[in-house]
Amino acid sequence: MKQEIRYQASAEVVSFIHRWQNWLKDERRYSLHTLDAYSRDLSVFFDFLKDYLKRAAERQDLASLDVHGFRAFLSARAARHIDKNSLAREISTLRNFFKWLNRSKILKNEDISVIVNPRRPKILPKALDVTQTFNLLKKSEKNQNW
């Protein structure tokens, strides 16, 4: 990770986050880039929770967080005009973290599974114009067989 990421959470919750990060790195073999992105997403979530709860999040807060809390987070992110692809990754991060908490028997909260990813625009490949097509054909004729 590039620089230390701080989490607005109790020491106990921060220890869970570090264990989850180690699990992602060691057992799931996530790249450092992915781990960094997931860690930053989780930091943003805990920053939101601090404002939402008016204090640093604790274990029982994570266990009792309902669908409305998760949707409030997504609404706050959407209000800041966060790209839908980034929102989808943040939801994926939260699902992954809460699933790990459940599997590790730390706490159970399945409300995140109700949240659906935002619809992302489907971008079709752009067609080549006539000049580009002829240039491509000329280049392929120049290549020799293996």
Language-model features: where?
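Conserved catalytic core of the tyrosine transesterase superfamily
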Residues: 1-146
